From Swiss-Prot:
This is Acylphosphatase. It comes from Xanthomonas euvesicatoria pv. vesicatoria (strain 85-10) (Xanthomonas campestris pv. vesicatoria). InterPro entries: Acylphosphatase (IPR020456), Acylphosphatase-like_dom (IPR001792), Acylphosphatase-like_dom_sf (IPR036046). It holds the Pfam family Acylphosphatase. Keywords: Hydrolase.
Length: 88
């Protein structure tokens, strides 16, 4: 299992970005979380197969219809201690 931390910036808060990310992550078989950050970005930490992480990254660039994504940064991270994908 691999893990990645994504930081998504743009118009990504108040547009169902976290909930939509959770739906996509669960469909891809990923675990982790999506959280709003004080600077207006959304942090996504996800763990699963490399292919699923790549698919999530591609989706993060699009997001839900009301979102306008300006940037997605990806870094490796430790596998999160969870068996689900949560928002917070």
């Amino acid at each position: 299992m691999q893990a990645a931390r994504f930081v998504v910036s743009g118009v990504v808060q108040g547009v169902w970005y976290r909930a939509s990310t959770r739906q996509r992550a669960v469909a891809l078989g990923l675990v982790g979380h999506a959280r709003n950050q004080a600077d207006g970005s959304v942090e996504v930490v996800a763990a699963g197969s490399a292919a699923a992480l790549d698919a999530l990254e591609a989706w993060l660039w699009q997001g839900p219809p009301a979102a306008t994504v300006a940037a997605v940064t990806r870094t490796a991270c430790a596998v999160p201690p969870t068996e689900d994908f949560v928002t917070g």
